[in-house]
């Protein structure tokens, strides 16, 4: 009985922590009016953000607006937030692949929407919405991969930094073009980029806006692999690449991702406590007991 109560207490503590992590960065106390900016963005239609989930625990998000190089319209920004909400509630999920329709990743924001929200107040509202969404994407208890075909420009480059891994195809490129537009990243891309490549390389990528091709991205640590398959088969190749990282029970894979999130976002003492709590949710669990019975530690 004592063990059950202890495990239940750990589970509740973990649930509270996860709920806190899923909370948005911005709310009304920061001057963020989500309903107002969504109403504004809803005027700019076109494209879609499509979500599919499979029985093997892998979800796919497709940025689908190929006539505009998969740029985000206003309704697509809203849809992305809704898709992330869906994934937050998907208890069987282990992995996520984000890609763009028709062999290009994403070219950032659609200019029609950008021009219509050109004043600083509405621009900051859009910024807060997308930072909320991409931070929640990064915090999902899923191993996430951005599959980059063609171009990842501006906001598209920022989107790929919200994933755990980035796979690039031959001939693709990542480019932070914000400076050429008289801007800096606003969807959290700069902060995430520094964590990925370091401040020195991040400064070069943001101030010089170079075209980062696959080989260079590998050297920088911005990409994790270069896929060489055909355009038709590259999504399957990405699935094969992610499989070793999500093999096994979903609760264990999700626990691994959770300790990574806590280690990245919390101070050391809090991260250690969170790790202990998450450890308690899998210790003595079915997967742990089966592994002990099989003696699989060194196999």
Curated annotation (Swiss-Prot):
The gene is echdc1. Belongs to the enoyl-CoA hydratase/isomerase family. CDD domains: crotonase-like. InterPro entries: ClpP/crotonase-like_dom_sf, Enoyl-CoA_hyd/isom_CS, Enoyl-CoA_hydra/iso. It is found in: Cytoplasm, Cytosol. Its EC number is 4.1.1.94. This is Ethylmalonyl-CoA decarboxylase. Transmembrane segments: none annotated. It is an enzyme of class 4 (lyase). It catalyses: (2S)-ethylmalonyl-CoA + H(+) = butanoyl-CoA + CO2; (S)-methylmalonyl-CoA + H(+) = propanoyl-CoA + CO2; (2R)-ethylmalonyl-CoA + H(+) = butanoyl-CoA + CO2. One of its GO terms (biological process) is fatty acid beta-oxidation. Its main location: cytoplasm. Decarboxylates ethylmalonyl-CoA, a potentially toxic metabolite, to form butyryl-CoA, suggesting it might be involved in metabolite proofreading. Acts preferentially on (S)-ethylmalonyl-CoA but also has some activity on the (R)-isomer. Also has methylmalonyl-CoA decarboxylase activity at lower level. GO terms for molecular function: carboxy-lyase activity; methyl/ethyl malonyl-CoA decarboxylase activity. Keywords: Cytoplasm, Lyase. It comes from Xenopus laevis. GO terms for cellular component: cytosol. It holds the Pfam family ECH_1.
